[in-house]
From Swiss-Prot:
The chain crosses the membrane at residues 26-49, 58-79, 101-120, 141-158, 197-220, 238-260, 272-291. This is Olfactory receptor 1D5. Residues 1-25, 80-100, 159-196, 261-271 are extracellular. The keyword Transmembrane applies. One of its GO terms (cellular component) is plasma membrane. Odorant receptor. It is found in: Cell membrane. Its main location: membrane. It comes from Homo sapiens (Human). GO terms for molecular function: G protein-coupled receptor activity; olfactory receptor activity. One of its GO terms (biological process) is signal transduction. Disulfide bonds join 97-189. It is a multi-pass membrane protein.
Length: 312
C-alpha cells in the first residue's frame, strides 16, 4: 500500500486490551472514573495556583503547566477509549491516528521537559537561595516554558512525519488502547529499521538528557541538604523536593516499563504498563503534590468549597 495515498484513506481498528463485552464494561467504568478523578485533580491544581497569590512562584507556575499537560494528555487518549468500549465500531481513521500520536508524543515530551525545568528550579532554590529571585525571574520562567513547548511540538512533528513514510498492509488491528508509535511500527510491512533507529536516537536525546540533568541536580540538592545544620530545615527542604522526585520516579518508571524493550519483543497486551503510563501517572501527580507539599495541602480544597462559602 502506498504510504502517501492509500494510507490516508485507510482505517485502523482500536481493539483495546480486551474483546470480552463483560470486561469492556468493567474497563469503561474504571477508565471513566480514573479520567474524572484526573480531570478534577488537575483542574483543582490549576485553579488553586492561579487564584492564590501565595502560590504565584516559579515552582507552582511550572506545576500548573504540568497539570495542564496531564489534563490534555488524558483527554487526547481516554475519551476515544471510552467510545470504543461502548461501541461496535472501533475504527479510527489514518489521519485521526496520526493526530492522536502527534499529541501523545508532544505531551509526553512536554511533561519530560517541564519536570527537568522544575528540577532546575528546586536546584536554584536549595543550592543558591540568595540568587533565587534573580535566577528564576518571570521572564526566564516564560522563556524556559516556551522552549519546552517549542521542542515538544517539533519532536511530535518529527516522529509523526517519519510515520507517514511507513507503509501498512494486511490487518490493521491495534490491540492497544491508543495509537502508539511502537504499535504502528509493529504493524508496518515496509522496512522500519531506519525509522526505528531514528526513534531510539532522538528518544535517548530528548528523554535521557533531561533525566541526566535531573539526576545531577538532585545529587547536588541532596549534598546541600546534608550540609544543613538544622534538622528541621533539612526536613522542610527535602519535603519540598520530595513531591517532584516522586512524580519524576513515577513518570520515568512507567515510561521505561512500556518503551525499554526491543521492537520485536514489544507486547501489545502489556495492559498493566499501558494503564500506568496513560492514566495512572497523570491521575497520581496532583495527589503526590498535595500529600508531599505543605503549601498545596489545603489549596485545592479551598477552591472546591469556595462557591459554597457565604460572603462575609
Amino acid at each position: 500500500m502506498d504510504g502517501d495515498n492509500q494510507s490516508e484513506n485507510s482505517q485502523f481498528l482500536l481493539l483495546g486490551i480486551s474483546e470480552s463485552p463483560e470486561q469492556q464494561r468493567i474497563l469503561f467504568w474504571m477508565f471513566l472514573s480514573m479520567y474524572l478523578v484526573t480531570v478534577l485533580g488537575n483542574v483543582l491544581i490549576i485553579l488553586a495556583i492561579s487564584s492564590d497569590s501565595h502560590l504565584h512562584t516559579p515552582m507552582y507556575f511550572f506545576l500548573a503547566n504540568l497539570s495542564f499537560t496531564d489534563l490534555f494528555f488524558v483527554t487526547n487518549t481516554i475519551p476515544k477509549m471510552l467510545v470504543n468500549f461502548q461501541s461496535q465500531n472501533k475504527a479510527i481513521s489514518y489521519a485521526g491516528c496520526l493526530t492522536q500520536l502527534y499529541f501523545l508524543v508532544s505531551l509526553v515530551t512536554l511533561d519530560n521537559l517541564i519536570l527537568a525545568v522544575m528540577a532546575y528550579d528546586r536546584y536554584v532554590a536549595t543550592c543558591c537561595p540568595l540568587h533565587y529571585v534573580t535566577a528564576m525571574s518571570p521572564g526566564l520562567c516564560v522563556l524556559l516554558l516556551s522552549l519546552c513547548w517549542g521542542l515538544s511540538v517539533l519532536y511530535g512533528l518529527l516522529l509523526t512525519f517519519l510515520l507517514t513514510r511507513v507503509t501498512f498492509c494486511g490487518p490493521r488491528e491495534i490491540h492497544y488502547l491508543f495509537c502508539d508509535m511502537y504499535i504502528l511500527l509493529w504493524l508496518a510491512c515496509s522496512n522500519t529499521h531506519i525509522i526505528h533507529t531514528a526513534l531510539i536516537a532522538t528518544g535517548c536525546f530528548i528523554f535521557l538528557t533531561p533525566l541526566g540533568f535531573m539526576t545531577t541536580s538532585y545529587v547536588r540538592i541532596v549534598r546541600t541538604i546534608l550540609q544543613m545544620p538544622s534538622a528541621s530545615k533539612k526536613y522542610k527542604t527535602f519535603s519540598t523536593c520530595a513531591s517532584h522526585l516522586g512524580v519524576v520516579s513515577l513518570f520515568y518508571g512507567t515510561l521505561a516499563m512500556v518503551y525499554l524493550q526491543p521492537l520485536h519483543t514489544y507486547s501489545m497486551k502489556d495492559s498493566v504498563a499501558t494503564v500506568m503510563y496513560a492514566v495512572l501517572t497523570p491521575m497520581m501527580n496532583p495527589f503526590i503534590y498535595r500529600l508531599r507539599n505543605k503549601d498545596m495541602h489545603g489549596a485545592p480544597g479551598r477552591v472546591l468549597w469556595r462557591p459554597f462559602q457565604r460572603p462575609k
